[in-house]
Amino acid sequence: MKTLFLLALLALVASTTSAQYSVGGGYNDVGGGGGSQQCPQERPNLGSCKDYVMERCFTMKDFPVTWPTKWWKGGCEHEVREKCCQQLSQIAPHCRCDAIRGVIQGKLGGIFGIGGGAVFKQIQRAQILPSKCNMGVDCRFPSGYYW
């Protein structure tokens, strides 16, 4: 019973936090700014960017396999980043940070967002995607907003 109550409380806090940031607009701090232009509501396909942030390689079609030794030896990082950059280039510059945040939102942190240093590292990787792709200034997500 106590566990059920805690789960309900966590769900309430998560939905309240999500609504708080959804109502206030995006966190797009690239050079062009958010301005008065609206970004599309549908989420763009940034699957490779999610894989890059999560340090995943796809070795078989639609079957994610994480190979840390292969990743750090450069076996697939470059290829995944290039695909991510190609996908990011299809998004308007003022919408890129919101799109990146939207794609990784909820994907980080393991159980109930608890992941320690790994989550921080993944958020940092997500924030620097635009500069890694030579597409402008890094994104800045709100501090303490770790999904």
Curated annotation (Swiss-Prot):
Record-linked Gene3D superfamilies: Plant lipid-transfer and hydrophobic proteins (1.10.110.10)
Disulfide bonds: none
Position of the signal peptide: 1-19
GO biological process: defense response to bacterium
GO cellular component: extracellular region; membrane
The keyword Membrane belongs to this UniProt entry's keyword annotation: yes
Pfam families: Tryp_alpha_amyl (PF00234)
Tissue: Found in endosperm and aleurone layer of developing kernels, but not in the embryo.
Subcellular location: Membrane; Secreted, Extracellular space
Keywords for this protein: Antibiotic, Antimicrobial, Disulfide bond, Membrane, Plant defense, Secreted, Signal, Toxin
Alphabetized GO MF terms: nutrient reservoir activity; serine-type endopeptidase inhibitor activity; toxin activity
Propeptide, chain numbering: 20-28
Matches recorded under InterPro entries: Allergen/soft/tryp_amyl_inhib (IPR006106), Bifun_inhib/LTP/seed_sf (IPR036312), Bifunc_inhib/LTP/seed_store (IPR016140), Glia_glutenin (IPR001954)
Record note on modification: Five disulfide bonds are present.
Function statement: Acts as a membranotoxin, probably through its antibacterial and antifungal activities, contributing to the defense mechanism of the plant against predators. Forms monovalent cation-selective ion channels in membranes. Contributes to grain texture and hardness.
PANTHER family (UniProt xref): PROLAMIN PPROL 14P, PUROINDOLINE-B
Record protein name field: Hordoindoline-B2
